[in-house]
C-alpha cells in the first residue's frame, strides 16, 4: 500500500492493522494523521484493532494534546479514540492502562471543558473506578490535583457570579462527576491506594468542604465519607477533620441532614468508632471556633441517648456522661446554648430517659436551665437586645417546663426549692401561658393550698390576689379555680369556713359577669360540694341568695346555665340518696323555672331537657340518657349550638360512698310516685307532677314565644308521651293535649311563636303528627269520638301537608289495625287522596305498603265498591307504567346506587303484589269486569317494549282465577296404573299433559301454568256401555283390553274446526325425550306460591350475649301469645306440603314443630329459636340455631330484656332487617303485670328507609302479630332485592314462566318451516306466549 492509497480514505472502507503498523508514524503530516485517526475512530464501531496498532497510533499522536496545539477538536478526538477502543476491549492490559493514563495525567490543559473530557476518559479507562491496576499509585494525586483546581475556581466566586448560568452549571456538573468517580474508587479499589495518597485525597476533600459553598458540595462530600466508612477506613490523621465536617452538616436544616445522620451512624458502628467518639468529646470540650460543629456534637450525643443505639463502642457512654459532655460547651455561643437547652427538653419529654435521671443529672439540668434563663426577656433592659433568639428561648422554656418532672425533683427541693420557686415567679410575667401554668402546677403538685400545708391560707390568699389583679388569661384563671376546687374536695369541718371566707365569697362578689365555662363551673362545683357535705347555715343562705341573683337578667348566660346545672345536679344527688323532701323542692323549683316565661332562656331550656328525660315503668320513675338532641335540627334547621348542656360535676367531687357520678341517666327509684298533683309529698315518697307537666306542654304549644324551646319540646315530646306507665293516671290532660294538637293540624288554632323564614308550616306538622301518633298507646281509654278524631287528623295531614304525608300514611296504616271501626268509613276518601299523591316518588313505597296491608284485612274491605277497587288498581298500574327505567349500572358496588335501584325494583314488586292480592280479594262474580281495565293498564305500561315477565304472570293469574276460586296449588298426577300413554303439548305459556290409562280407561289432564298446576281426571264411558246393559254377564267373558283412545284424541275435541294458524299451533313435545322429562320434573319442583322465611328470636330479661339469647327455650306468656297470632303451628315431619324454609324434616334437628303463615299468593315460615332444641353441652354457641337465623334476611326480635337491643347482637352477613318488639314498660318481670302495648322499631343494616317501623311505633298486643307479620313480608321482599344487588325482583311465578319459555324456545323451531317469515307482531306473540287479549269477551 503506497502513501497515496493510505491518504485516499474515500477509496478504502477502513484502515487495517497492517496499514497502521507499516505506514503510520509521527512523520506523517499533522492533517493526514488526523484524518487517519478519525477513520480508525469510526472503524472501531465495526472492527477490533490490535493493542499494538492502537498503542502505535497513540504514541504517534501525543502532539495532538501538547500545548503547541490549541485545537480542542483534535484533543477531543484523541480521548474519544481511547474511550472507544477501551470500550471494545474485554480486558485491558496494565501497559495499555498505564500508557493511556500517562496522557490523561500529563495533559497540560486545565480549563473546565478539558478537565471534564479527561475525567470522562479516566472513568472509561478505569471502568468507573472498578479497575486501577497499573495506576494505583498515581490516581489519588491526580484526583487531589483536580479537587484543588476546583477549589481554585471556587475562590474566584466573585468572577463566576458575573458569568452566565450555563458556565456555573458546567462547573457544578464537573464537580459532581469528580465526586462520583472518587466515591466509586473508594468503594471498589481503595485498598490498592497507598495511605499517603489516600490521606492526600481526603485532605483535598476536607479543604473543598471547608472553603467551597456548602450547598454545592455537602451531599457529595457526605457520600464520599459514607463510602470510605462503609467500604474502607478513614485515615487516622484526617479523622478529626472528618468528624468535624459530619457534626457541622448534622445540624443543617437542608435535606442532607438525614444523610449526615446516616453517615454518622455508620461511623460510630465502624472499627474506628472509639477514635470517632474521642474526637466528638474533644469538639465538645475544647473546640470554641466552629459553632456548627459543637452544635452537631451536642445533637449527636442527644441522638445516641434518644435512639438508644446499641453498639459496643458506645456501651461506655452512659446517660450521665452524655449530660456531662453536653454541659461542657455551655456559654460558648448563643446557638450552642440553645441546642443544649433543646437537648434538655427532649430528654425531659422522653419517659425512658426521665426515669433514669439521678441526682447529679438533675443538678446539671437545673444548672443549664438557670444559665439559659439569661436569654429570656425577664426585664426591660438593654442587655436583652443582644440576644437574637429571645422568642425561641421562651418557646423552648415553655416546652421544657411542660415536661419538667417536679415529683422527680422532690429529693432536690431542700437545695433548690427557693431558687426554683423564685425563678418561676420571676419569669411568670413574661413567659407564655403554658409556662405560667407550671407555677400553678407547682402549687398543685406540692399541695400548697391544701389544709395539710402549714402555709395553705397564705398561699390561698396569694392565688386570690392573682385572680383579682387579672394578670392571668382566661385559661390560667380556670386552672387557678381548679386548684381551689381540688382543695375544696379535701376540706373538713374546720377548713371549709376558711375556704369560703378567704376565697370563695370574695370571688363570688365580682363573679356574675364571667362568661366562660372553665372559670364559672369550678365555683358552682364548690358550691355543690359544700352544700351536700357540710351543714353550714351561712353557706346555705348564700347559695339561695346566689340562685335568686343568678337567675335574674343581670347575670351572664354562662352563669345562668351553670346555676341551673347545679340545681339539676343537686336533684341527682338527693335522688341517689333517696331524700324525699329536697327532691320535691328541687322538682318544684325547676318546674317553676320551666313554666315562667320571664326566666332566662338557658335556664328554661335546661329544665325542659331535664323533664323530657323522665320515664316510668309499672312501679317507679327513672331518667333516661338516650335523648337525641339533634333530632329537631334534621327537620326544622335549628342551630344545635342554641341547645345548652348541663355542665358535668368534677370527678374529684364524686364521693363513692354516698354519691354516684352525676350523668343524665338514672335507674328506677320507687321513692318517686306518679301523681296528678304537683304539691303532694310525704316523708317517705315523692310525687311526680305528671298532670302539671302535660299542662305545661299543652300551654307551651299555645303561648310559648321562644321558637327554640317550642320546637325542642314538640320534637322530643313523642318519646315521653308514648310512655304509658308515666301518664296513664293523667288521662284528662292526655285528652286535652290530644284535642289541642288535633286543632293545630286542623288549623283551628295556631302556635304563637314566630316561625323562622326558612321553616315551612308543613315541617312543623311532622312532629305534631308524630306526637298524635304516639297517643295510640292510650287508645283503649279513648271514646269512639276520640278514635274518630284520631283518624280524621291523620287524614287531614294526608290532605293538607305534603311534607308530612309519610307520617300520615303510617298512622293511617296503624289505624287499620288498631281502629278498624273508625277508619272503615274513611277508606274510600283516603284511597282517592292516595291516588292523587302517586306523583310524589318519595311516597311510593309507603302508599303501596299501605295497600298491601289493607288487602290482608278482609273486614275493612268487605264493603268496598267497584270505584274503590278501581282506585286501588289505578294506583298500582300507574306505578307500573311509570316505573324507574333509569337504573344505575348493576355492576356498580356503590351502596347509594344499590339502594336507589333496590327501591325502584321494590316499588315494581309491590305494585304487582297489589294487583295480585286485590284481584284475588274480589268476589268471584266481580272479577270479570276488572280484567279488561287491568289489561289496558298493563298494555300502556308495556307500550313500545316487550312484555315483562311480571306482566305476563299477572295475565296468566287473571286467566286462571277469573272464573275459579280454588286455592293456588301445585297438583301432580294421581295415576296408580303403571301402563299409561302420555303426551305433552306446549300452548302459549302453559304445558298441557294428557295421561291415558291403557287398562282402566281413565284419562288425566294436567295443565301446568306459571300461576299453578291443575289436574282433572276423566273416564270414557262409551266403551263400557254394552256391558252395562247386559243382565247376565258371566266371568268367562272378559272386558276388552287395550288402549281405548290416544291423548291426541282428547285434545282434538278442543281444537278450532276452522283451523289454527301456524304460529298458534300447540307444540307437541317428544314423549321419549329425557330432556323434556327432566324439564317438566324441574318445573314441578318449583313452588307455586311465593315462599319466604324470617327469624324469630326471644330475648330474656337482662340478656345481651348471643349465646344466652339463642339458648332460650322457655319464653314468656306474652311471647307465646304473639307467636300464636303470628302464624299456624305445623308438624315438620308430617306436613310435607308446608314450606319449611330449610328446617330439618327427618330427625327433629330443628325441633318437631314450626310456625308458618299463608295466604293465596304468599307463605312464610318462622325460624323460632325457642322451638329448636338447645344442647349447651355439645353446642354452647347454639350454632345449629344460628345457621337458620344467620341466613334469614329479616329477624323478629321479641325483646323483654329491659335493655336497648343492638343490631349486631347476633351478627350475620345476610341479616338486613331486625324488627325489634319491646314492651312499653321496662320491668315486665319485676312488675308481673300484663303488657298490652309494645314499641316496635326496624333496625337496618344500612340506611334503608322502607318500613313502617323505621321510626318506632306503639302497637297494642291485639294488633301486634298481624302488623309485624305484614311488615316482615315486605322487609323480606326488599331484602331479597337488595341481596341481588338491586336486580329485578324475580317472583316465583316469573321463575316458572321462564322455565316454560326455555322449553318452548327449544322446540319452537321444529314447528315453523325454514322459509316461513314472521312479522314483528307475530314474533312478539310467539315470544310472549300470548296475544294478551281480553279473554273475558269470549268466556
UniProtKB/Swiss-Prot annotation:
**A Pfam family hit:** Rap_GAP
Any one cellular-component term (Gene Ontology): TSC1-TSC2 complex
SUPFAM superfamilies with a match to the protein in the record: Rap/Ran-GAP (SSF111347)
Q: Where is the Rap-GAP domain?
A: 1109-1303
Keyword annotations for this protein?
Cytoplasm, GTPase activation, Nucleus, Phosphoprotein
Any idea where this protein resides? Cytoplasm; Nucleus
Which positions carry Phosphoserine?
1036
Q: Does the keyword Iron apply?
A: no
Output the Gene Ontology terms for molecular function: GTPase activator activity
Q: Which InterPro entries match?
A: Rap/Ran-GAP_sf, Rap/Ran_GAP_dom, Tuberin-type_domain, Tuberin/Ral-act_asu, Tuberin_N
Q: Could you name the domain of life of the organism this protein comes from?
A: Eukaryota
List this protein's GO terms for biological process: negative regulation of G1/S transition of mitotic cell cycle; negative regulation of TOR signaling; negative regulation of TORC1 signaling; positive regulation of autophagy; positive regulation of L-arginine import across plasma membrane; positive regulation of L-leucine import across plasma membrane; regulation of small GTPase mediated signal transduction
How is the subunit organization of this protein annotated in UniProt?
Interacts with tsc1.
Its annotated function is as follows: Together with tsc1, required for uptake of various amino acids from the environment and for proper conjugation. Involved in induction of gene expression of permeases and genes required for meiosis upon nitrogen starvation. May act as a GTPase-activating protein (GAP) for the small GTPase rhb1.
Q: What is its main location?
A: cytoplasm
Task: Tell me yes or no: is Cytoplasm among this UniProt entry's keywords.
Answer: yes
Tell me the protein's name.
Tuberous sclerosis 2 protein homolog
Amino acid at each position: 500500500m503506497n502513501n497515496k492509497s493510505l491518504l485516499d480514505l474515500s477509496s478504502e472502507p477502513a484502515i487495517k492493522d497492517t496499514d497502521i503498523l507499516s505506514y503510520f508514524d509521527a512523520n506523517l503530516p499533522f492533517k493526514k494523521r488526523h484524518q487517519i485517526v478519525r477513520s480508525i475512530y469510526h472503524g472501531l464501531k465495526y472492527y477490533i484493532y490490535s493493542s499494538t496498532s492502537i498503542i502505535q497510533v497513540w504514541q504517534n499522536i501525543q502532539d495532538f494534546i501538547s500545548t503547541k496545539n490549541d485545537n480542542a477538536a483534535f484533543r477531543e478526538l484523541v480521548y474519544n479514540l481511547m474511550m472507544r477502543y477501551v470500550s471494545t476491549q474485554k480486558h485491558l492490559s496494565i501497559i495499555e492502562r498505564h500508557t493511556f493514563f500517562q496522557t490523561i495525567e500529563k495533559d497540560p490543559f486545565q480549563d473546565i471543558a478539558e478537565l471534564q473530557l479527561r475525567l470522562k476518559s479516566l472513568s472509561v479507562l478505569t471502568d468507573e473506578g472498578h479497575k486501577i491496576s497499573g495506576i494505583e499509585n498515581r490516581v489519588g494525586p491526580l484526583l487531589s490535583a483536580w479537587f484543588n483546581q476546583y477549589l481554585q475556581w471556587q475562590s474566584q466566586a466573585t468572577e463566576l457570579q458575573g458569568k452566565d448560568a450555563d458556565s456555573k452549571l458546567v462547573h457544578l456538573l464537573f464537580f459532581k462527576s469528580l465526586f462520583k468517580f472518587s466515591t466509586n474508587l473508594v468503594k471498589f479499589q481503595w485498598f490498592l491506594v497507598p495511605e499517603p495518597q489516600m490521606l492526600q485525597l481526603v485532605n483535598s476533600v476536607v479543604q473543598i468542604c471547608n472553603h467551597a459553598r456548602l450547598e454545592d458540595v455537602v451531599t457529595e462530600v457526605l457520600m464520599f465519607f459514607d463510602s470510605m466508612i462503609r467500604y474502607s477506613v478513614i485515615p487516622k490523621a484526617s479523622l478529626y477533620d472528618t468528624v468535624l465536617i459530619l457534626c457541622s452538616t448534622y445540624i443543617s436544616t437542608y435535606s442532607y441532614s438525614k444523610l449526615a445522620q446516616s453517615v454518622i451512624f455508620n461511623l460510630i458502628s465502624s472499627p474506628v468508632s472509639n477514635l470517632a467518639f474521642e474526637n466528638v468529646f474533644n469538639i465538645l470540650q475544647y473546640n470554641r471556633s466552629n459553632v456548627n460543629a459543637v452544635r452537631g456534637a451536642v445533637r449527636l450525643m442527644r441522638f445516641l441517648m434518644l435512639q438508644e443505639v446499641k453498639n459496643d463502642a458506645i456501651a461506655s457512654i452512659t446517660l450521665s456522661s452524655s449530660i456531662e459532655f453536653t454541659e461542657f460547651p455551655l456559654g460558648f455561643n448563643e446557638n450552642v446554648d440553645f441546642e443544649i437547652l433543646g437537648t434538655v427538653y427532649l430528654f425531659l419529654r422522653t419517659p425512658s430517659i426521665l426515669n433514669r435521671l439521678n441526682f447529679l443529672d438533675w443538678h446539671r439540668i437545673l444548672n443549664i436551665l438557670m444559665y439559659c434563663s439569661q436569654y429570656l426577656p425577664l426585664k426591660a433592659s438593654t442587655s436583652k437586645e443582644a440576644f437574637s433568639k429571645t422568642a425561641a428561648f421562651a418557646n423552648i422554656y415553655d416546652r421544657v417546663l411542660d415536661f419538667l418532672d417536679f415529683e422527680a425533683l422532690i429529693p432536690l427541693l431542700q437545695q433548690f426549692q427557693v431558687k426554683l420557686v423564685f425563678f418561676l415567679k420571676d419569669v411568670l410575667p413574661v413567659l407564655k401561658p403554658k409556662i405560667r401554668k407550671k407555677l400553678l402546677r407547682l402549687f398543685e403538685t406540692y399541695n400548697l393550698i391544701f389544709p395539710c400545708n402549714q402555709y395553705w391560707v397564705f398561699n390561698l390568699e396569694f392565688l386570690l390576689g392573682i385572680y383579682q389583679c387579672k394578670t392571668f388569661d382566661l385559661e390560667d384563671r380556670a386552672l387557678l379555680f381548679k386548684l381551689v376546687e381540688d382543695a375544696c374536695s379535701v376540706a373538713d369541718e374546720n377548713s371549709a369556713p376558711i375556704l369560703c371566707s378567704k376565697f370563695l365569697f370574695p370571688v363570688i362578689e365580682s363573679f356574675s359577669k364571667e362568661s366562660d365555662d372553665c372559670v364559672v363551673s369550678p365555683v358552682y362545683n364548690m358550691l355543690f360540694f359544700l352544700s351536700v357535705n357540710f351543714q353550714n347555715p351561712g353557706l346555705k343562705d348564700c347559695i339561695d341568695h346566689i340562685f335568686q341573683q343568678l337567675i335574674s337578667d343581670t347575670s351572664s348566660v354562662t352563669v345562668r346555665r351553670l346555676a341551673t346545672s347545679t340545681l339539676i345536679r343537686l336533684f341527682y344527688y338527693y335522688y341517689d340518696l333517696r331524700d324525699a323532701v329536697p327532691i320535691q323542692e328541687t322538682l318544684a323549683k325547676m318546674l317553676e323555672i320551666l313554666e315562667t316565661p320571664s326566666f332566662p332562656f338557658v335556664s328554661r331550656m335546661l329544665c325542659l331537657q331535664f323533664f323530657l328525660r323522665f320515664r316510668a315503668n309499672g312501679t317507679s320513675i327513672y331518667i333516661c340518657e338516650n335523648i337525641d338532641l339533634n333530632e329537631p335540627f334534621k327537620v326544622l334547621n335549628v342551630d344545635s349550638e342554641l341547645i345548652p348542656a348541663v355542665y358535668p360535676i368534677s370527678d374529684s367531687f364524686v364521693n363513692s360512698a354516698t354519691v354516684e357520678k352525676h350523668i343524665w341517666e338514672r335507674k328506677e327509684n320507687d321513692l318517686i310516685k306518679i301523681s296528678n298533683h304537683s304539691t303532694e309529698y310525704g316523708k317517705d315518697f315523692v310525687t311526680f307532677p305528671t298532670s302539671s307537666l302535660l299542662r305545661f306542654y299543652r300551654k307551651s304549644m299555645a303561648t310559648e314565644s321562644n321558637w327554640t324551646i317550642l320546637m325542642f319540646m314538640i320534637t322530643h315530646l313523642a318519646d315521653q308521651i308514648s310512655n304509658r306507665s308515666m301518664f296513664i293516671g293523667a288521662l284528662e290532660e292526655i285528652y286535652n293535649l290530644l284535642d289541642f294538637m288535633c286543632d293545630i293540624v286542623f288549623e283551628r288554632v295556631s302556635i304563637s311563636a314566630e316561625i323562622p323564614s326558612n321553616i315551612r308550616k308543613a315541617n312543623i306538622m311532622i312532629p305534631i303528627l308524630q306526637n298524635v301518633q304516639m297517643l295510640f298507646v292510650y287508645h283503649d281509654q279513648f271514646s269512639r269520638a276520640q278514635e274518630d278524631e284520631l283518624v280524621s287528623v291523620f287524614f287531614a295531614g294526608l290532605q293538607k301537608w305534603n311534607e308530612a304525608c309519610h307520617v300520615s300514611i303510617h298512622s293511617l296504616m296503624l289505624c287499620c289495625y288498631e281502629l278498624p271501626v273508625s277508619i272503615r268509613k274513611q277508606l274510600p276518601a283516603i284511597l282517592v287522596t292516595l291516588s292523587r299523591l302517586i306523583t310524589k316518588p318519595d311516597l311510593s313505597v309507603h302508599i303501596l305498603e299501605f295497600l298491601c296491608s289493607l288487602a290482608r284485612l278482609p273486614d275493612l274491605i268487605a264493603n268496598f265498591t267497584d270505584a274503590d277497587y278501581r282506585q286501588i288498581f289505578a294506583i298500582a298500574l300507574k306505578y307500573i307504567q311509570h316505573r324507574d327505567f333509569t337504573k344505575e349500572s348493576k355492576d356498580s358496588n356503590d351502596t347509594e346506587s344499590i339502594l336507589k335501584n333496590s327501591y325502584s325494583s321494590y316499588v315494581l314488586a309491590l305494585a304487582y303484589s297489589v294487583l295480585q292480592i286485590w284481584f284475588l280479594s274480589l268476589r268471584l262474580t266481580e272479577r270479570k269486569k276488572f280484567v279488561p281495565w287491568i289489561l289496558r293498564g298493563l298494555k300502556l305500561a308495556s307500550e313500545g317494549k316487550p312484555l315483562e315477565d311480571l306482566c305476563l304472570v299477572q295475565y296468566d293469574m287473571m286467566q286462571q282465577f277469573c272464573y275459579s276460586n280454588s286455592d293456588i296449588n301445585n297438583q301432580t298426577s294421581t295415576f296408580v296404573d303403571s301402563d299409561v300413554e302420555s303426551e305433552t303439548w306446549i300452548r302459549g305459556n302453559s304445558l298441557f299433559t294428557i295421561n291415558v290409562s291403557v287398562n282402566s280407561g281413565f284419562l288425566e289432564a294436567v295443565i301446568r301454568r306459571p300461576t299453578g298446576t291443575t289436574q282433572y281426571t276423566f273416564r270414557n264411558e262409551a266403551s263400557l256401555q254394552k256391558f252395562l246393559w247386559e243382565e247376565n254377564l258371566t266371568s268367562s267373558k272378559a272386558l276388552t283390553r287395550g288402549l281405548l283412545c290416544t291423548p291426541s284424541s282428547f285434545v282434538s275435541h278442543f281444537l278450532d274446526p276452522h283451523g289454527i294458524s301456524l304460529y298458534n299451533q300447540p307444540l307437541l313435545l317428544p314423549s321419549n325425550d329425557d330432556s323434556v322429562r327432566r324439564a317438566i320434573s324441574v318445573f314441578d319442583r318449583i313452588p307455586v306460591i311465593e315462599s319466604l322465611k324470617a327469624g324469630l328470636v326471644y330475648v330474656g330479661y337482662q340478656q345481651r350475649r348471643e349465646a344466652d339469647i339463642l339458648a332460650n327455650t322457655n319464653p314468656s306468656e306474652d311471647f307465646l301469645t304473639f307467636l300464636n297470632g303470628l302464624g299456624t303451628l305445623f308438624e315438620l315431619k308430617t306436613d310435607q306440603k308446608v314450606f319449611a324454609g330449610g328446617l330439618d324434616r327427618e330427625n327433629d334437628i330443628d325441633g318437631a314443630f314450626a310456625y308458618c303463615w299463608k295466604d293465596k299468593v304468599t307463605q312464610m315460615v318462622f325460624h323460632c329459636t325457642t322451638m329448636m332444641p338447645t344442647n349447651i353441652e355439645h353446642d354452647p354457641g347454639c350454632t345449629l340455631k344460628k345457621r337458620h337465623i344467620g341466613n334469614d334476611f329479616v329477624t323478629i326480635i321479641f325483646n323483654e330484656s329491659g335493655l336497648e337491643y343492638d343490631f349486631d347482637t347476633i351478627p350475620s352477613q345476610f341479616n338486613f332487617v331486625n324488627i325489634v318488639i319491646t314492651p312499653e314498660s321496662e320491668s315486665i318481670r319485676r312488675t308481673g303485670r300484663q303488657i298490652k302495648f309494645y314499641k316496635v322499631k326496624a333496625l337496618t343494616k344500612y340506611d334503608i328507609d322502607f318500613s313502617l317501623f323505621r321510626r318506632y311505633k306503639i302497637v297494642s298486643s291485639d294488633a301486634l302479630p298481624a302488623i309485624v307479620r305484614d311488615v316482615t313480608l315486605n322487609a323480606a321482599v326488599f331484602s331479597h332485592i337488595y341481596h341481588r344487588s338491586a336486580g329485578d325482583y324475580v317472583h316465583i311465578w316469573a321463575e316458572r314462566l321462564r322455565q316454560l319459555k326455555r322449553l318452548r324456545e327449544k322446540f319452537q323451531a321444529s314447528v315453523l318451516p325454514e322459509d316461513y317469515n314472521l312479522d314483528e307482531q307475530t314474533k312478539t306473540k310467539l315470544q310472549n306466549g300470548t296475544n294478551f287479549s281480553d279473554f273475558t269477551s269470549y268466556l
